[in-house]
Regions:
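Residue-level marker of positions within ordered structural domains that often coincide
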Residues: 8-9, 46, 59, 86, ...
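Sec/Tat signal peptide C-region and signal peptidase I cleavage site
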Residues: 15-20
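N-terminal secretory signal peptides
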Residues: 21-74
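Short acidic-hydrophobic surface loop/beta-edge motif
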Residues: 26-34, 44, 101-104, 112-120
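C-terminal partner/receptor-binding element of secreted or periplasmic proteins
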Residues: 121-153
Length: 153
């Protein structure tokens, strides 16, 4: 019964986050007998702002723990977001600071999170990527800004 409750809780928590599409990975080291370290790129659309797509690159630790999810990935990432369609969302109705994407980077409590912030005075949406842990996070971070522009028809 506890297991069923945990699965249901995880399903509810993941409803609001965007789902990423993996685009590919590039090896950054060569390990002869185990999986290589690599950098992987994923894409996701902002679930509340249709017309904005983001791409995130993240370092992935190789080694023998990698196939089992036991490695803790480093907190190295980059994010780039762009307007790719007309945006009709009223910025004043968006939450001031809302998580739009999260991805586990360790089997034990480490997560990359992306938050959306709204800069109403500049008509811009800011995306902030950070890494969190249960006890402490990392000062590593990255941002991408998307000025909302008129879209040609």
């Amino acid at each position: 019964m506890k297991w069923l409750f945990m699965v249901a809780a995880l399903a509810v928590m993941s409803v609001h986050s965007a789902h990423a599409t993996d685009l590919g990975c590039v090896s950054t080291t060569f390990n002869a007998l185990s999986p290589n370290d690599k950098v992987c790129v994923s894409a996701f659309d902002d679930p509340q702002v249709p017309g904005i797509a983001c791409h995130i690159s993240q370092a992935r630790k190789g080694g023998w723990g990698q196939p089992f999810g036991l490695n803790e990935d480093p907190s190295n990432f980059s994010i780039s977001c762009r307007q790719n369609a007309p945006i009709d969302v009223d910025l004043s109705k968006l939450a001031e600071n809302e998580e739009v994407f999260s991805e586990k980077t360790s089997i034990f409590f480490k997560t990359t999170r992306i938050y959306r912030m709204v800069d109403k005075s500049r008509n811009t949406i800011v995306y902030l990527a950070i890494s969190t842990k249960i006890i402490n996070g990392s000062p590593e971070n990255a941002i991408s800004t998307v000025p909302i522009m008129p879209w040609p028809h």
